[in-house]
From Swiss-Prot:
The keyword tRNA processing does not apply. The keyword NAD applies. InterPro entries: ADH-like_N, Glc_1-DH_arc, Glu_dehyd_C, GroES-like_sf, NAD(P)-bd_dom_sf, Zn_alcohol_dh. The lineage of its organism: Archaea, Methanobacteriati, Thermoplasmatota, Thermoplasmata, Thermoplasmatales. This is Glucose/galactose 1-dehydrogenase. Optimum pH is 6.5 for the oxidation of D-glucose by NADP(+). At the physiological pH of 4.6 found in the cytoplasm of Picrophilus cells, the enzyme shows merely 10% of its maximal activity. Homotetramer. Belongs to the zinc-containing alcohol dehydrogenase family. Glucose 1-dehydrogenase subfamily. Pfam families: ADH_N, Glu_dehyd_C. Catalyzes the NAD(P)(+)-dependent oxidation of D-glucose to D-gluconate via gluconolactone. Is also significantly active with D-galactose as substrate, but not with D-xylose, L-arabinose, D-ribose, D-mannose, D-allose, D-glucosamine, 2-deoxy-D-glucose, or glucose-6-phosphate. Can utilize both NAD(+) and NADP(+) as electron acceptor, with a marked preference for NADP(+) (20-fold higher activity). Physiologically, may be involved in the degradation of both glucose and galactose through a non-phosphorylative variant of the Entner-Doudoroff pathway. It comes from Picrophilus torridus (strain ATCC 700027 / DSM 9790 / JCM 10055 / NBRC 100828 / KAW 2/3).
Amino acid sequence: MVRAIITNAPNGGVKIENVNINEPEHYEVKLRPVYTGLCGTDRGEVLGNLSFAYNEPGYNYLVLGHEAICQVIEASENPYKIKPGDYVVPVVRRPGKCVNCRIGREDDCSDGDKHEAGITGLHGFMRDYFYDEAKNLVKINDKNMVKVAVLTEPTKNVMKAFEVFDTVSKRSIFQGDDSTNLTKNCLIIGTGSEAFLYAFMAREYRFNVFMTNRHPVGEEKLSIISRINADFYDYTREDPLKGIDLLIDTSGDPGTIFRFVRKMNYNGVVILFGTNGRAPATSIDGEDIDYIIERNISLVGSVDGAKRHYLRAVEYLEKWNYSEGSVINRLITGVFEPEDVSIFTKKPENEIKSVIKWS
């Protein structure tokens, strides 16, 4: 028996209880979570809003959790030098058999036959212990990084998305005539933890960074936005920003997205990351299509990331952890016990990122 936070996918619901999970006869690594992160995907599952989520075969429940920093309890000899006492981040997606999955790019799975821990057919990390293979773990060498390393999983999404941007933006000369992005504007829709991580990375690219939402934000969020030299505006009260070169959406709301697509500069790039199957429909007419075509605007979706993106995420989190007064740590706004399952259905006030402390 193991204590776990579970749902019944795709129907939803959440509870913590002791459950029977078959233990492998042979395993490389036994892990205990230290912190697990909570995000919109977890809440969507609990509310029954993610129709693509499903239980692990053979079980009438699914253990939640795909963001985690864990400590190794036991480990057999392995080529990755993972040993007891190490801190590691487990990779979420597990490969199927398509060509991309076979080369470690399950983030670009060609046929959808992959699994995602805590989401699609594979138990997640919100439990007292679990087993895994060493190849699915990313080691955290700096013990001062343990808490902030819970942000590795969402940060790897950002690394992948900017890699996509690098590829797509090569269709034309994207930079200004000084060969930089210093005169280019990046607008990020949303003010959740993922949006902030996108803002951190956009700043690395030397964009002028803007964050927007349909409502005012609290003083803590405004303070962080200012600290990273970004700007915020409430698009329902202020004139829409014009002249956008890179638009990143974390909301999944089509009406909001197309509000700003119509403000894109020539050769602009739109990265669609947020998902929200319950978002209302929006109207798109021929002029919108003309606008996109005549300006060579690229709209591209980006999901998940490969193991290499986890490694890059750790590098940037280390940099941000030791720079600018460790402002990255301020994204973690609440630490809760596993029994506090109410946070899955009621978002804490002024939340950016809530995490669960397991030990």
